[in-house]
Structure formats: C-alpha cells, structure tokens
C-alpha cells in the first residue's frame, strides 16, 4: 500500500488530511500531512519533509503538493530526486486526494496517474442550481 503525504502551505495540508479521514475513516494510517508555515525557510521545509518520509517507514510514498513551483513543491522535488519509491503530483485538490485514498493499493506509478486524473476530472465549470440529474456543466 502506498502512503500519501500532503505537503502544502499551512493549514491546507492538515485540512485536506482531515477531509480524507472524515470521508474515509479507515485511511488514518495512510494519509499524512506537512503544513508549511510562512516562517520556515526552504531548507527547513526540506529537512522536515525528509524526516517525515523517514518516519513513515521507507515504503512507497505519493507526495501531493499544493502549487507547482512554490516552496512545498521545490522541497518535495529535492527530496524525491533519486528516491525511486516516491512520486510527486502538484495541484492537490479534494477529488485528487479521494482518488488517491481509494486506489492506494495500486502500484506507485498507477496511483500517481490516477491521482492526476482525479484532480483534473474534479475541476469543471458549473452553472445553475443543483438538480437531481447532476451538475449543469458549462463548456464549449
């Protein structure tokens, strides 16, 4: 089973972890969070991220970060470089997280692909009031 680690600007990581555990209570051991406060310099983020991954036992880890190019992402890129049992996906959202929790038994590469698909599929324009037939999607 792949362990999930959410790394994001504080308090987003722990908030997303709480959402995952609210909907999937059995995932408590498999979803971890690292909130990055504005006061941490980049080297501190990287140090804490390395320590958290080490404490998770050395298995496969899918890291979900909030924004590509931001400090949490750069730290995760540095930590995952040369570490074959980690994958990194940027742009975490709730659909991505839920998909990751549901498919944590997949291989690491397959899970990263499913996480990306879940995140992308969960972003769509919606118009109008809710209905029993589903959302009204606005599109081309």
Regions found by a protein language model. Name each.
Residues 1-140:
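N-terminal loops that bind phosphate or other acidic moieties
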């Amino acid at each position: 089973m792949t362990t999930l680690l959410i790394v994001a600007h504080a308090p987003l990581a722990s908030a997303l972890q709480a959402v995952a555990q609210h909907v999937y209570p059995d995932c408590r051991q498999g979803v971890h969070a690292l909130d990055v406060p504005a006061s941490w310099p980049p080297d501190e983020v990287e140090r804490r991220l390395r320590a958290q991954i080490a404490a998770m036992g050395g298995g496969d880890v899918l890291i979900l970060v909030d924004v590509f190019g931001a400090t949490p992402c750069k730290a995760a890129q540095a930590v995952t470089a040369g570490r074959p049992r980690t994958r990194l996906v940027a742009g975490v959202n709730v659909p991505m997280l839920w998909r990751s929790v549901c498919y944590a038994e997949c291989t690491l590469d397959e899970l990263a692909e499913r996480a990306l698909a879940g995140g992308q599929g969960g972003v769509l324009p919606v118009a109008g009031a809710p209905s029993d037939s589903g959302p009204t999607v606005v599109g081309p």
